[in-house]
Design a protein with these regions (language model features):
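Flexible, solvent-exposed loop/hinge segments and secondary-structure transition points
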Residues: 1-197
Length: 197
């Protein structure tokens, strides 16, 4: 009996390992394609060259970002990943900024919010309000908290998490150093800024 159970466990383990080996690469490729599509979706239309992903440390955490350039090599935007915690867990959001720190677009990469409630954060009815949102001119918080953002009905926790994530992305954008650099109309890569300090 023990030998039979051991044999069944070995066969099942072998099958599981085989399935993982067959699916790991396609799953990784699909995730990379989804990330690349999200980057293009959130950046300004003038972006023709997108830099490889980098990371920046901000307040003890590391954030992934991609800089984007136009045909002349001028920095036109930045896509930043943030993961605020909503009602159902982390909401992974890619936030695109133009060179002046204005939000171009947002894209939810993954979320586990309640279907029919918080999961509405992926719908354009909620996310479209962030296009053209300037965090330096408007309050990036839900109206219930005195901000300028319309919350999802019956999903205040998700709405707060989403707006908190975007506010964090705006701070990370400033930490990368884009706003002060680009206001001088001088495209500079962040690593060059660090070397000159």
């Amino acid at each position: 009996m023990t030998i039979c159970l051991l044999a069944i466990c070995l066969v099942c383990s072998g099958l599981l390992a085989g399935v993982y080996a067959l699916t790991a690469e396609p799953i990784a490729a699909a995730a990379a394609a989804k990330n690349e599509a999200a980057i293009k979706e959130v950046l300004p239309e003038t972006a023709v060259t997108i830099e490889e992903e980098r990371t920046v440390d901000y307040e003890g955490a590391s954030y992934a970002y991609n800089l984007a350039y136009d045909e002349q090599g001028n920095t036109v935007g930045c896509a930043i990943n943030v993961s605020p915690v909503g009602f159902g867990g982390p909401i992974v959001i890619k936030v695109g900024f133009d060179a002046n720190g204005v939000i171009c677009n947002t894209k939810v990469l993954s979320q586990a919010e309640t279907p029919g409630l918080g999961a509405k954060c992926v719908e354009p009815a909620f996310s479209e309000q962030f296009k053209g949102f300037d965090p330096s001119q408007k309050n990036l918080a839900v109206k219930k908290d005195g901000g300028d953002v319309d919350a999802i009905t019956a999903s205040t926790i998700t709405s707060r998490a989403y707006t908190d994530g975007l506010a964090l992305a705006a701070k990370v954008f400033q930490a990368i150093g884009q706003t002060p650099i680009l206001l001088n109309d001088t495209p500079v890569i962040p690593s060059e800024v660090e070397e000159s300090k």
